Amino acid sequence: QAYDKSHNELKASYIEIDLQRTKDGHLVAMHDETVNRTTNGHGKVEDYTLDELKQLDAGSWFNKKYPKYARASYKNAKVPTLDEILERYGPNANYYIETKSPDVYPGMEEQLLASLKKHHLLNNNKLKNGHVMIQSFSDESLKKIHRQNKHVPLVKLVDKGELQQFNDQRLKEIRSYAIGLGPDYTDLTEQNTHHLKDLGFIVHPYTVNEKADMLRLNKYGVDGVFTNFADKYKEVIK
């Protein structure tokens, strides 16, 4: 339902999917490695089978935390699999997918690429037009994907405070496999944004929820932002 709202109502540019994997090997969309925060369950996603995960209520927490945006229909929402999302929105939607470190879920990258291929999202036309972007904080995960398919656009996520530690050698090494950089928005200045663009990166900061920050970052020249308020950002870029 969150994906329906962002895709159908708010017309967000991309459907963002954070991937975890169940005990029986299914890729599912969930931000955290545990189910504690966003369901009525406890423990790690990898300790649940898909059937067990589907028993959990993944919607009521949102109604409680964000009463202003609450909907009765969110109650008992189910955790979707990657395949269910790709099936629902089809090959013409845009997907921005985050992988974890390979040591958390070994083989996740191969699985993800197999799913994207099955849903006709890996043909060169789709990739050239940016229908799929894959991001990760893990260099190794991105490198694994790049080794398997060098046409998939990759974005290196950067922890808060880390960007300032990157010298040009490090940035160029990242640029050898990733087309984009995803820093915490508070780490961007006009100067370092221009420098990243000069090195050939697209720049997609996270998570920008205030209009003033959106305006400032657009002035710096970012290529887009991650936000919880796609409608607000659409007003800014009109």
Predicted features by range, described:
Residues 1-238:
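Phosphate-group recognition and catalysis centered on beta-loop-alpha active-site segments
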